[in-house]
Each structure stands twice: as C-alpha cells, then as structure tokens.
Amino acid sequence: SAASDVYKRQIVLNAANEAAVAAFLDRKISFLGIGRACREALSGLVLPAPKSLSDIYAADREARSFVDSLICSGRIS
C-alpha cells in the first residue's frame, strides 16, 4: 500500500542519513555527500514493506550497510 511505502522510505531515509552524517563527521565524505548518499539509498534499495518491528530493524540495517558500501567503494565522497 502507499502508506507502507511511505513508512519504508522514512526508515531508509533516516538510516541512510544517520550513516552518512557519521561518515561526514569522520571526514570520510563531504557535506554534499550526505544528500547524495540519501538519494542513492532511496533510489537503489528495494525492500519489502515492513510488517513487524524486526522488519523495520532489518530495513534500517540494510540502508546503513548500503550507504557504507557506497562510501567504501568511493561512489560517495
């Protein structure tokens, strides 16, 4: 449903933003890299709609891992 898609995107955006801000504070990416990381996570992750708290935690972990891999690969700087 549209509502579950909104929740999923909020989870991904929050986790991606937190991971990107942490990388920025560690001087691994630029300030503008935060926005790029969030956009990439929102457009690049295909996750099922969360149906439980464990689904929410899984989506959060997946988004953080996705952003970390973007940074480690040099796609976001």
Predicted segments, located by residue:
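Short, small-residue-biased leader/transition segments that mark boundaries at the very start
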Residues: 1-7
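NAD(P)-dependent dehydrogenase/reductase Rossmann-like domain
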Residues: 4, 12-13, 29-77
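Long, well-ordered amphipathic alpha-helical subdomains in the mid-to-C-terminal portions
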Residues: 15-20
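Hydrophobic side-chain positions on well-ordered alpha-helices
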Residues: 23-24
